[in-house]
C-alpha cells in the first residue's frame, strides 16, 4: 500500500495544526469534484467557492502531501520556458496573453495569505544567480522581456552587489525580483485548505480517486464512496498515477531532493543571506536555497527521472551546498527528503478538457508554486464560462515523450546528462 503520511521533512515537523479530515464513505453530489488537495486543487476550489459553486475535494493522502508540501518554498515568477520561446511556438497574440498572466500567481498567493490570514512565513525577494557571463547576459535579456509585460520590480546586480545579498563567491552577478519570495509551502497549503472549508467546501483525505465514470453526469469513484458532479477538475499532477491514461502518456514524474540544516544562529544565517532572500542559480539543472524563520538553510537540487527515491539524499545535496557555502562544513543536516514534480517535454504546463466536463492542469515542470495558483483561477474562470485565458494555455502543444511511458525516463535522463555537461562547461 502506498504511504499516505507526510514525509519526515522540515515542513512536516514545523507544520501548523492539522485538523483530522474524514474519509469519503458515502455517495455525495456536488457542483465540482476536485481531485487532489495540492495547490492546483485548493486554488481551484477557493476561486469556485468564492463564486458560489459547491465543491468537494478528494485527496489520496493528506492536504499538501505531494509537491505542494515538499518543494523549495520559492515564489518564482513566469514559466519554466521563457515567454520569447513561447512566442516563437504559438505566435505573438497568444504569447501576449500568456505573458500578461506570467506574474499573476505570486499576487494570488499574497492575496490569499492576507485575506485568509494564512501563517506561512511569507518573505519578499528572490535572486536569480548567474555563474557565468553567458548566464548574466540571459538575465539581462530576461529583464527586458519581463518589463515588456509590465513586470518592473527587477534589479540587475553585478558581482559586488550580489555579494551584498548572498554570502557566496561563485556568482558573477544576478537579478533580484522583489515580487518573488518564499513561504513555508506546507503551511500555505494547510491554510488554503482551511479557507476552503471556511467557505463551505468539503475535503476528504485518504480518499483516492480510483476511477472516473465519464459522461454527461460524471462520477468519481473512491474505495468507499463516490462523488457525482457537474464538473471534474483533475489536479493530481505528479501523484496522479494512471487515473487518466491520456495525461500520463504526455508527462513524467521527476524527483528533486531537499535538505535542511540545523539552526544556524543569527550571525551565520545573516552571513549567508543578509536580506533573507531566496536564491536559485541559472543552470539548467539548478540549485536553490532559502532561509527559514528559525534560521536554518533549506537547500535543494538534483533531478531523479521517473520519480525514484534516492537512497542517500544528503550525500547528493550536501556537496552542492558546501560548494556554495563551504563555511557550513561542520553544520548538521536535520532533515532530508524528496518530492516529485511533473515534467512535460515542452516544459510548459498542460491544460485542457476531456469531453465537456472534465478539466485538468498539470506539468508545471519546476515552476509550480506560482503557476498552480494561477491555474486554479484560470480553471475556475473556464467553469464559469470565461474561457479565453484557459484556452490560451489549452492551445499550447501537448507533446508525448519519445518512446512512450516505457522509454521516457532514459530519454529524459540522456537529455539531462547533456544539459549537465553544458552547465559544467558553461556552454
Residue ranges of model-derived segments:
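Helical element adjacent to the flavin cofactor pocket in flavoenzyme catalytic cores
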Residues: 137, 141-145, 170-230
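Glycine-rich FAD pyrophosphate-binding loop
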Residues: 50-70
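Active-site substrate-recognition segment that forms the wall
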Residues: 107, 115-123, 209-211, 217, ...
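N-terminal Rossmann-like FAD-binding beta1-loop-alpha1 element of flavoenzymes
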Residues: 30-57
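Dinucleotide-binding Rossmann-like beta1-alpha1 core, especially the glycine-rich loop
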Residues: 78-160
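Helix-loop-beta segment of a Rossmann-like dinucleotide-binding subdomain
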Residues: 21, 118-128, 161-195, 199, ...
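C-terminal catalytic lobe of FAD-dependent flavoproteins
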Residues: 307-309, 314-424
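Extreme N-terminal leader/targeting segments of oxidoreductases
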Residues: 1-32
